[in-house]
Amino acid sequence: MARKKGDGSLRALVIRFRRVGDAVLAVAACSSLKRSFPDIRVDFVLNEAIAPLFEGHPDIDRVVTFTDTDNANPWRYVRRVFDVVRKTRYDILIDMRATPRTLLFSLFSLRTPYRIGTRKPYSRLLHNYRVADRIDPSLDMVQRDLLLLSPL
């Protein structure tokens, strides 16, 4: 994987909204990114209510929060997503949900070399790396989340 010009570090955005349990399990992917790419900067997108659980985690450089107000107003949400992805040019975007709402991050990040998400019919145009998350029913959620790192 090529390094960014300038400071030489890769930048990753991991998107895992809503449920606290799912977000806690998703930290394993952030930790794996840090082990594989020690200089990587990992930003983690969460709802504001659960963000304090992740602030200060050694494998998460920045917690990007969305408020209930951001999520309730579609125009505000779109603007907020746009601001997040334009503020930092990411090398890797990992969409752990691949819902129509989270796909907006990929839509505004078409120059991001690795736009990774789960394989869904509607994600084909926006994720350039799609991973089948139901490939093995014996896999737990952490293992399925880690599969999203396989394109790297």
Which residues fall in each region the model found?
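Catalytic machinery of carbohydrate-active enzymes
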Residues: 1-152
